[in-house]
A protein has these predicted regions:
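A short local loop/turn or secondary-structure capping micro-motif enriched for an aromatic residue
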Residues: 20-30, 157-161, 218-221
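Generic N-terminal segment detector
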Residues: 1-72, 77, 275-279
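Residue-level marker for the onset of beta-strands and adjacent loop->beta junctions
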Residues: 8, 136-138, 261
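Generic recognition of flexible, low-complexity loop/linker segments
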Residues: 1, 127-128, 252-253
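Active-site microenvironments in enzyme catalytic cores
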Residues: 40-207
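Catalytic-pocket segment enriched in acidic/His residues
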Residues: 160-279
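Short acidic-glycine loop/turn motifs at beta-strand connectors
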Residues: 7-8, 13-17, 142-147, 204-207, ...
Length: 279
């Protein structure tokens, strides 16, 4: 099942049919068994598919209500190595090696819902940063009880130059206007997402590809319920929350984003999250 939040309402897509759901987003998705809950709406009259296609193509919003977005870091070996490389001159590389092997994961706050960009929107790079990358990440929707209910694609925009200068600058490297995008929908399977699921990214500059890559979830060191458990250990989220789970796709050190770049993040079952870097 795919659940879209659009300008004209909530649209559920399953088995080639689309259904309108008249409900607030928060109450709709914060369910103890979201897949079963959504299945109840498939007994209604399906939407005209051309109208549903138009609503999704022209009016898709970020699949978030009032939830917070959090993020996990250094969950893939590639990410650990990249963080160590960018911070070696400041002496911070030790911390990334240590957190990769530690029981406790790196978790940090990413964005409030009003700062989240949807597919088709613009993400930003900081004016005081010299080295910037997108981070394509499977993102979990976790209900208020701490159970993973759905998945979406996320882009954790990051300043490698600022974080590399000093690990304590991570909030500035990660949290700013236009630094977080989610979409295009919530993927709600009836079972946990497969560890063989592939995450892909392509970046185009003036129509030419400048970076592409893909990785499977089974390359992640941490388990998804493990990350959710740590986040909920001493935190409560009344309407649930979103958790980005880290990236294993890191461009080479010679690469940095530029205004006008088009970033496309694709995850099997979810679709494509596409954003343009703002001028």
């Amino acid at each position: 099942m795919q659940l879209f939040k659009t300008k004209t309402g909530n649209i559920l897509r399953t088995e080639g049919k689309s259904f309108h759901i008249d409900s607030s987003w928060d109450s709709l998705i914060n369910q103890p068994d979201l897949h079963q809950h959504l299945s109840g709406f498939t007994k209604g009259t399906p939407l005209n598919e051309s109208e549903a296609d138009l609503a999704i193509a022209n009016g898709t919003l970020p699949p978030i209500g009032t939830q917070e977005v959090w993020a996990a870091g250094v969950t893939y070996l590639k990410s650990r190595d990249a963080r160590m490389e960018e911070s070696k001159d400041s002496g911070g590389d030790f911390f990334y090696r240590k957190v990769y092997d530690a029981d406790r994961p790196e978790l940090f706050f990413k964005a409030l819902s009003h700062r989240v960009v949807g597919t088709g929107g613009q993400v930003r790079i900081r004016k005081d940063s010299k080295w910037d990358v997108p981070e394509p990440e499977l993102t979990l929707f976790i209900d208020s009880k701490g159970s993973i209910q759905a998945y979406t694609a996320g882009n954790d925009m990051s300043s490698r130059s600022i974080e590399g200068e000093n690990p304590l600058y991570l909030p500035q490297a990660k949290m700013y206007e236009g630094s977080c995008s989610l979409g295009p929908c919530l993927f709600v399977p009836g079972h946990p997402i497969s560890t063989e699921t592939k995450i892909s990214i392509t970046i185009h500059r003036k129509t030419k590809p400048v970076f592409d890559g893909n990785i499977q979830l089974n390359r992640m060191k941490r388990q998804l319920p493990e990350l959710a458990g740590w986040l909920f250990k001493e935190m409560k989220f009344e309407n649930g929350c979103f958790l980005m789970t880290g990236t294993g796709l890191v461009p080479g050190n010679e690469f940095t984003l530029q205004p006008g770049d088009v970033i496309a993040i694709s995850i099997e079952g979810i679709g494509v999250l596409r954003n343009v870097v703002a001028s």
